[in-house]
């Protein structure tokens, strides 16, 4: 999973957002666990936002909120989801 995420990071740096999104999805889906999966989902949400896909970015942060409430990323996911919901409603 970590290799998928690192590849996603490289594509994100290159601005190849569709590829980054694909690799982050693979990273999050590979042997899901409480520690790494929320990290990969956060990267996925960021890539969605950079691609202008606020709906999927919000849904990804929502997934972190509902499935990983004990994760370090939980509070940041809540904050970013609220921010994006505000942008989406304008």
What does each model-found stretch correspond to?
Residues 1, 28-36, 65-76:
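Short solvent-exposed coil/turn linkers within tandem alpha-helical repeat scaffolds
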């Amino acid at each position: 999973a970590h290799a998928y995420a690192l590849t996603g990071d490289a594509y994100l740096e290159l601005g190849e957002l569709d590829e980054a999104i694909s690799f982050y999805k693979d990273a999050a889906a590979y042997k899901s666990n409480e520690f790494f999966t929320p990290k990969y989902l956060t990267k996925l949400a960021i890539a969605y936002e950079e691609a202008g896909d606020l709906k999927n970015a919000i849904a990804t942060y929502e997934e972190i909120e509902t499935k990983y409430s004990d994760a370090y990323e939980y509070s940041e996911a809540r904050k970013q989801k609220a921010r994006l919901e505000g942008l989406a409603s304008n």
